[in-house]
Amino acid sequence: VGSEMCIRDSAKAVEQVVSVLRDLPGAQVSVSRTPDASGDQVWVGTAETTPGIDGLVASLGGSKAATLPADGYVIASGRRSGHNVIALQGKDARGTFYAVQTLRQLVRHDKVASVTVRDWPLMPIRGGIEGFYGIPWSHQARLDQFTFYGRHKMNTYIYTPKDDLLLRAKWRTLYSGDDLARMKELVEGANANHVDFTFALSPGNDICYSSDADFKATIAKFDQLRSLGVRSFYIALDDIEPKFHCDADRQKYPNNGDGKWIADAQADYLNRLETEYVKKNGLPPLQTVPTNYSGSGEDPYKAEFGTRLDKDIRVQWTGEGVFSPSITESSVARAAQSYHTKHLYIWDNFPVNDGRRNRLFLNPLTNRDPNLYKHIDGITSNPMIEPYASMPALANYGDYTWNPTTYDAKASMSAVLDELAGGDKATRAALRVFADLNQSWPYRTPDTHAPALTAAIDAFWAVRDKGSVDSSLKDRLAAIVRLPEALAGMRQQGFFQDTRPWINAASQWARAGQHFVTMLDAIDAGDGAKATNEYLAAQKQVDLAKRPTVDDQGSDGVLHKAVIVPSVGDGVFDAFAKKASAQFAAFIGARPASAKAYSGTASSSMGQWEANSPSRMVDGNLSTLYWTNVSPEKGSYVQVDLGSVKPIGQVAVHQADDDTATGDMFYHAALEYSVDGSTWTAAGNFDSAPLIKHTFEAPVQARYVRVRATDANPGAQWVKIREFEVTPPVGVYSTNVKAAEGSSVALAFDGDVSTAFRAATPVKAGDFVSFVPAKGVTPRQAIVVGTARGEIQVRSGQTWTTIGTISDGAPFHAFAVPAGTNVEEVRLMLAAGSPAPVIREMTVVDRELKPVPTPTPTFTAAPTSGSSTGDDHGRPGYPTPTSTPSHGPRPALPSTGV
């Protein structure tokens, strides 16, 4: 394009062409309604608004746009009278606007490609429906959505946020004041970007369908919105109880138990709106979503609703389920037949995350049949609570609904990520790295989990098993660590702000991964001190990543700050941490001292989803689960009855889909136990904890154990309980040290280095912690992981031998056991006056770890200095306990450690 342009037509299309062309170096742009022979020209408009454009298109080798479907356009370019000329001709104003959007794509390296384009959509309805629960989009976010919709040739936005009381609870009330002013600005913003602002009213919770007053209230609401510029209207009848709210409806539509009664009432109300308001005012056809909005099979409600409904009314449908892993041509054809409509279109519940508010879904739209356009009017996407993070999926819908026969999910996603990132190559690469961490969509089978990260981790384990080195994981972890800085300058700042909690959590997980990798190298070198330091550093990062940092809003409309833990990495980070931690535990000989869970009868105050009954909480199978069909309210509970009063040492309640990631679960819970089911004793409170686990300092007696909600769940999330385990006490360890609240000596022998026995007070003379090694072990070293001071001793017969002293507060110590010693017990005699100890694990191993202190052994046949005579549990040399020690039968343990 040369130095001067002549642009013909009006408003938004011209404004955007000017914007595109002024970005070209040296360009001087003027706008005129007549051609200027002195410069290059860009003609913009329809045949009606721009006389002569038909002839220009023909002279440039194109075909005029008049024969195209609505929203279609033609682009033709070439030379005329010695000047470069481009024609952007639309079938209509919207088509002209879309021609400008394609022009943006044709500008490369400061030039406009010479092309001829003839383009039109295969689906007339293309866009989104703001129909989720949770924090509503901001006013600015909605305005930015309209700009994004326009650029991606999406023409529909359905306004139905669940938080707008004037759509639901107060649907008869008109907008006023600031609400009315904001609504006017939204409508104007949508219209400016050629987006149909569809106003969706949801009166179904209290409407009297046959009431003339309620009909007039509907008309009054529609009239107010029409005065603002709205021309598209919608009645939402989803998520309501199928019941009447007035005697007039009950008398006019008798309930015969077949579903037809409610269908008749709804259809008559909708038909009256279509006839007396929509058609009367020359508006586009009314739209609706019925109460039964999923499944393609026939039923009395669908048949009656569709048969009775005006044939022009558009009917929305979500697919075979509320969430549809795939939508096939045959399924849509059956649904259209079941609803008796030729105007079915899809409410697609992707990438909506109001049921999984800890997640982002940045995977591309897939598994929508390319031939759906033959049977439906279009698709609207139900996006995420995060408006800007929804843009990748929305762009996919724009591409798919425009031409599903050529839709390329991978290419579409790549293009929109680049658009959001901006022109910087490093930022684009970083955004792809982040998107890879959010690929799992749980309704899809088979699912995909962070594929690039997974490949790097798989390669790491594969070469490590062979004793080789692969750098791909280290490189990817380094890239993830840098994400907060790498994405801070991306073009679409709204996306960065939306996703920041997940970006930060990803960086923390990656730092943990780096420490785990270094830890594994230290394990290979037999360096216990370094391995322990790296493990603890990794665990610190994991703890940071698991902090709640995402805000939420419940049905009460109250915003709650930082109550949701962001889940990122599709579970791949968690799995890597779990495997690496297991290798560290094996390295130091940590094995859980465990007991088999009691059998019991499970019950719940909540209902169940499908066949997922409470009994599955106690079937001993972590792959099955109890799944509620409601969100817990304050006081809701799940419970296990042991049949009789029994001693309890530990309770573990495995929630959600994994012990390490939040999901459907109790977010605010109290663990309680009772002898009689009436009087309850609190064991602890747990917030945002997928694994509710409590080990009692001393065994308690109880018949009933329950988890009770102390508050309602954020986001109305349901609850999944995979297993509710109540186990007896285990007696391979002992102490006379009082544990801090919420802690237990058992945590020093549970095989989990992330937990710890924490003493309640500084050490007194005679305080100790001890354990009996597993039978068959030939200990070569005694290991203490934690911060404590004192002497490590081993017992053989009646003689205690001090094999080392801990005095430096370091988190790892390994002490050589004198050759030939028959170790029957190991104890840590804590140094009087030292700080309260924190002991993560005490173990023995049958190999040598380094560094190994080798002090001269000392022998003690009599009780340890400062302790009483006599012995605890019949063992020599023990002080009198100051608290009840754990005791009981000692099960045999694996030979690798405790």
Feature names for model-found ranges:
Residues 708-715, 828-835:
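Short beta-strand-plus-loop segments that form exposed binding edges in beta-rich domains
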Residues 131-132, 169, 173, 227-231, ...:
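Catalytic-core regions of glycoside hydrolase
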Residues 413-567:
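C-terminal non-catalytic alpha-helical accessory regions
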Residues 137-282:
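Substrate-binding cleft of carbohydrate-active enzyme catalytic domains
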Residues 2-7, 316, 564-588:
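Short, small-residue-biased leader/transition segments that mark boundaries at the very start
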Residues 586-646, 654-665, 677, 685-688, ...:
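Disordered, acidic Ser/Thr/Pro-rich linker "stalks" and the adjacent N-terminal cap
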Residues 674, 793-795:
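Conserved Ser/Thr-centered positions that define the repeating blades of beta-propeller domains
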